[in-house]
């Protein structure tokens, strides 16, 4: 079952889900990247380790793209985690990876799908539309210039251009395709209880957009939902029918039957809502 969100799913920021999501997303990005790389490059998934001060060892995957001929690092693709944006040690670990690559004249691609915490990169948002999620590309040939691809909670995740060596054309990566594959392969639909509130408390603009998506999809604590977040009248009807069968100690009859039929019809809803 797909995510009820058109792009990134903020329920994945849950501490219990993010590590698996981060790993799976990076692996899906890696898989999608491979066909777009010309023969002169190879991609590998690496991992940084650190303790964010909560006595928990954090492991964060990222992708390095290197030239086959000499092994020189060309592009670093990294995914921001909640710990990077909320814990000093996590922030420093992420920025250290970025500084090392930047000093070596490497293209940098940052994927930030985290609502909470402070942005990793500081730049003016004047004249730019509001966004909740961003992919920021920094080319080695223009290290002071950012290419920013954005999305909100109400939009699909963007496609972005991933730079390689200056004499090679960019490869285009569809982040939404990677996310959808990640969500399906890891079966997050079966692991998220959309009846509860999301694990993040975003700022005003993002909160408004989040509330709108929850309202449209009838999520976030609405009564009578399945764990996947959708109203499921047939299953409710079965449960209610079983209840009345138990009350009647057999086949519903008389007033019990009338109550059962009325409740069943209410659960089914008017024609066209089934």
Descriptions of predicted regions:
Residues 224-274:
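Intrinsically disordered, low-complexity, basic-enriched segments
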């Amino acid at each position: 079952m797909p995510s009820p969100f058109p792009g990134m799913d903020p329920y994945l920021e849950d501490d219990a889900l993010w590590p698996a999501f981060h790993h799976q997303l990076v692996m899906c990005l890696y898989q999608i990247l491979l066909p777009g790389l010309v023969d002169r490059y190879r991609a590998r998934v690496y991992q940084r380790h650190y303790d964010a001060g909560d006595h928990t060892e954090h492991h964060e995957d990222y992708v390095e793209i290197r030239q086959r001929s000499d092994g020189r690092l060309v592009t670093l693709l990294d995914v921001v985690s909640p710990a990077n944006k909320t814990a000093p040690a996590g922030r420093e670990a992420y920025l250290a990876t970025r500084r090392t690559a930047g000093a070596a004249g490497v293209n940098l691609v940052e994927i930030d799908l985290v609502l909470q915490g402070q942005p990793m990169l500081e730049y003016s948002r004047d004249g730019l539309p509001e966004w909740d999620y961003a992919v920021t590309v920094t080319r080695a040939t223009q290290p002071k210039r950012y290419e920013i691809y954005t999305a909100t909670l109400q939009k699909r995740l963007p496609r972005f251009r991933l730079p390689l060596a200056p004499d090679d054309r960019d490869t285009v990566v569809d982040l939404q395709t990677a996310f959808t594959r990640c969500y399906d392969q890891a079966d997050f639909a079966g692991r998220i209880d959309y009846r509860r509130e999301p694990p993040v408390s975003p700022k005003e603009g993002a909160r408004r957009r989040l509330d709108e998506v929850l309202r449209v999809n009838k999520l976030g604590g609405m009564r009578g939902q399945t764990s996947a977040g959708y109203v499921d009248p047939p299953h409710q009807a079965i449960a209610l029918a079983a209840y009345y069968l138990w009350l009647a100690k057999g086949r519903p009859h008389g007033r019990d039957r009338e109550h059962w039929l009325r409740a069943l019809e209410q659960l089914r809803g008017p024609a066209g809502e089934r």
